[in-house]
Amino acid sequence: MICRSLLLLRSNAASKASSIVKHVAATGCLPEYSSEAPARYFSSESSLQVDSTEENGFKGHGMLAPFTAGWQSTDLHPLVIDRSEGSYVYDINGKKYIDALAGLWSTALGGNEPRLIKAATDQLNKLPFYHSFWNRTTKPSLDLANEILSMFTAREMGKIFFTNSGSEANDSQVKLVWYYNNALGRPNKKKFIARSKSYHGSTLVSASLSGLPALHQKFDLPAPFVLHTDCPHYWRFHLPDETEEEFATRLATNLENLILKEGPETIAAFIAEPVMGAGGVIPPPKTYFEKIQAVLKKYDILLIADEVITAFGRLGTMFGCDMYDIKPDLVSIAKALSSAYMPIGAILVSPEITDVIYSQSNKLGSFAHGFTYSGHPVSCAVAIEALKIYKERNIIEHVQKIAPRFQEGIKAFSGSPIVGEIRGLGLILGTEFVDNKSPNDPFPAEWGVGSLFGAECEKRGMLIRVAGDNIMLSPPLIMTPDEVEEIISKYGDALKATEERIAELKAKRG
């Protein structure tokens, strides 16, 4: 059977792409000389579709596709998703896939939720668009702002600013923090600290905040005002005999040393995901955020919680801040806010910051930032309905009920010889493939182990996220127990097939 490989390779010529496609078609696997494979480090699954989509004669397209090697959109058949239903999506040839990533960590309520469709349709019929500039706005935007403020209970928040995505939310955070510090007469307090392996978006500023090399390389990033500190991944980065508690203490000390080196008067904010998502699903050590928050408070540095992935039930709590007792000054949300049915993101702003903006507005003038679609009435109407569903259907309790089996079922494969670590909580999981069960022994990059596993999953009708030799699962929050079992079964079958392929590659290597 033809292997639908997840090649994430760079190529300088279409002829090389064509030769790879021909090799896959002839042999069923990647050519072992594919030295460009390291470019796969931060690419999502980008399908080498040489089977089902070909039935419709679909090859190449007019899109410059996100996080996709340029030659793939010309030389390879894309996987074209045609419709969705519950936890499943279907391609244009009718093949069914369980969507074990919920789109991009986002379709929390699955596909084809009639209440969300009706909310959008009703609002389109009433008021399809009006802006929120100059103190003009719409009722859905006002209602949604109030609803979000009432749902966030980690601490009191003051105002909501609407964006269209998580990237825009984190980009806007920087401008808001700069505006705030200018209002306080602190023009030098402008630097941001983020973490290695973090993901905060792909705009110029949010990509700079992100700690993934692929978002910086060839884009002349990160911006000079962004600094990066340690990733809180205990399994990969702890010292010999270092406990999790000691590891967390060391990372907090390293953060403080970085602040002192740069000058506390220059550091404006620290941004962090409660659980790192695209960097490989990395939950922090238990006391990590307690120690980090103490350092930030000591030096009057704002804390931004990037809840774009973790908000609205993903971890088994309404917000990730609830899970780790985080008391942020600012919060970014998106994705599950509307279950991804309409583009929308938002910033939650603390009363302390909004009070400064209000009190200094006569001196500074208007907050001259926003987007045409900020608070779009249709997006807001859909988000309002999504938040109602989360509460009325007890989605948090549902996640808490099914998450243990999801976690235990996948983590049961931790003994695999190609698995280094399986980590996660709630309905989010990451698997890291390494040789010899050691974080210090990666597989040869040209083997593309994560991509091989992703291809095996896709062949079996399951879509996941691949990032180098890390793979991630983040299914819809509405998963049934039977669907959890389906994911576990397909994961196990794909893992066995990948183990066999790695054994073959090792045998050839000698």
Curated annotation (Swiss-Prot):
Q: Which UniProt keywords apply?
A: Aminotransferase, Mitochondrion, Pyridoxal phosphate, Transferase, Transit peptide
Q: Is the keyword ATP-binding assigned to this protein?
A: no
One Pfam family assigned to this protein is Aminotran_3
Q: What is its main location?
A: mitochondrion
> Which amino acid positions bind pyridoxal 5'-phosphate, per UniProt?
G166, S167, D306
Instruction: Tell me what reaction this enzyme catalyses.
Output: 4-aminobutanoate + pyruvate = succinate semialdehyde + L-alanine; 4-aminobutanoate + glyoxylate = succinate semialdehyde + glycine
Which EC class is the enzyme in?
A: transferase
Name the InterPro entries on file.
Answer: Aminotrans_3, Aminotrans_3_PPA_site, PyrdxlP-dep_Trfase, PyrdxlP-dep_Trfase_major, PyrdxlP-dep_Trfase_small
Q: Which residues bind substrate?
A: Y199, K335
Which is one GO molecular function term here? adenosylmethionine-8-amino-7-oxononanoate transaminase activity
Where is this protein found?
A: Mitochondrion
What EC numbers are recorded for this enzyme? Answer: 2.6.1.96
Q: N6-(pyridoxal phosphate)lysine (modified residue): where?
A: K335
The cellular component terms of Gene Ontology attached to this UniProt record, alphabetical and capped at eight, are: mitochondrion
Transit peptide stretch: 1-41
Gene Ontology biological-process annotations: biotin biosynthetic process; gamma-aminobutyric acid metabolic process
State its role: Transaminase that degrades gamma-amino butyric acid (GABA).
The Swiss-Prot or TrEMBL record describes its family as follows:
Belongs to the class-III pyridoxal-phosphate-dependent aminotransferase family.
Q: What is this protein called?
A: Probable gamma-aminobutyrate transaminase 3, mitochondrial
Q: What is the lineage of its organism?
A: Eukaryota, Viridiplantae, Streptophyta, Embryophyta, Tracheophyta
